[in-house]
Amino acid sequence: MPVLGALLAVAALAYGGAALAGYGTGELSIPGGGATTLLRAAVFATLAVHLGELAGARIAGPGPLPHPWGRGAALLGAAACFGQIAVLAQVSRLDLMAAYSTREGGLLLATANGFALAAAAAGPRRPAWAVAPLALVVVAEAWRAHPEAYTPEYGAALTVVHLTAASLWVGGLLYVLRTLRLRPDGDGRWRMFTRYARLAGWLYAALAATGLCSTLRRLPADVVFSTAYGRVLMAKLLLMAVVSAYALAAHRRLRRHRDPDGAAAPARAELVALAAVVAVSAVLTVVPDPHWLSLR
């Protein structure tokens, strides 16, 4: 029940976040914004589950592994992409074939195809074959997120790194926590958790650097609190502060007490906070470009 409640809260945040953030800004509401945000959050979550599973299996090392979720996640991600195309067709008053021919529709179709190929490759013998189609998903989503006329290639490159690092962090943590329940050996559990914590430190640095560059590039300083984009970004930063606190608490217990069970409690709270970050990140991709209201 707590897990279901957390998922429902995250879904509600994704669905209503864009409208809430845009209240009083004077910006136009986004047609179909709630449904688009919810579906985009599903894309981010399923990408994280699959990429995190591929990385987590290497981090876990020898021993029992949890049941793979990669194929199901990839199929759900493909369905979420097709759902976005349907919403695009409805709000634009286009038929599906016409929606496919638009820039966003074509990139969503490429993303869906990447997920479908990843699902086909996610067999028990060679699961790493899913890496290439998942890379297609990341690149297509990065290009879709940057339709602006000003140097979109720089924004897309930053998003590729940011989305990959975020997916490995969230999905890797989920996989490690699932594996932890199957491993009775305390020392082996500690080594697995330590390997993940080391990787997470590098991923955090990549996220911080790309996030800062993207913010400086996309958000003019004079509209930080007067646009939906600025407000959502501030909310994301606050959530990341919460995530950082939980991550540090887990790392401290691992380092000082070599206690994987004690570290698991703040790590689970970190995962819940990261789920909220995923939802807020999806909202960030839907709200209007803040440059329209900037005086600069």
Residue ranges and their predicted role:
Residues 1-296:
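Polytopic transmembrane helical bundles with strong interfacial aromatic enrichment
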